[in-house]
């Protein structure tokens, strides 16, 4: 039911947007994110390259925090991404994660923390979202920060890398099937 309501809202908002512009970047944050990005990018006469969702930006921030806590460093020193669909099915891309330019294996040996198990890391990242939800009753702050960061990157054209949801050549990126399949 919630998915249908959110899809209807996306359709209503996109109809309003397309009545006035076709050249403004659009950042979506509404769950189910990948489905709503697909709706916005394929059901309206709007450039697909201007429509993105926050993707796994929030999950990736939680991953960086988890790695930083294990290594006893600042999250700003960690480069790491969660990939896949936002939420419980996202997975950590640890083979390319770094701390201060070191691989996780190098950082583990240098900084003296235990090697990270991908399954445990994934569970910890997902659990951290539930901890926030149960502690505050909502998770609006984190996703708001992720959306603002993405919007600033777009507005400033700063060439930063963000794990977004987007449609390319009619295919939904990451692991989500097309809602029409």
Language-model features, listed with the residues they occupy:
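Conserved small/polar residues in nucleotide/adenosyl-binding loops
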Residues: 174-181
């Amino acid at each position: 039911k919630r998915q249908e309501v959110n899809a209807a809202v996306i359709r209503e908002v996109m109809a309003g947007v397309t009545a006035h512009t076709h050249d403004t970047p659009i950042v979506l944050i509404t769950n189910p994110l990948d489905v709503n990005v697909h709706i916005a990018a394929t059901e309206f006469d709007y450039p697909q390259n201007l429509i993105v969702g926050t993707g796994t930006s929030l999950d990736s921030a939680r991953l960086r925090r988890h790695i930083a806590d294990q290594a006893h460093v600042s999250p700003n020193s960690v480069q790491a991404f969660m990939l896949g669909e936002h939420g419980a099915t996202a997975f950590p891309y640890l083979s390319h994660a770094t701390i201060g330019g070191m691989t996780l294996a190098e950082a583990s040996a240098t900084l003296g923390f235990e090697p990270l198990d991908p399954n445990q890391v994934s569970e910890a990242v997902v659990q951290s979202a539930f901890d926030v939800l149960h502690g505050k009753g909502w998770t609006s702050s984190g996703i708001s920060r992720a959306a603002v960061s993405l919007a600033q990157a777009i507005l400033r054209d700063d060439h930063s890398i963000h794990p977004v949801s987007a449609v390319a050549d009619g295919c939904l990126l990451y692991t989500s099937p097309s809602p029409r399949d």
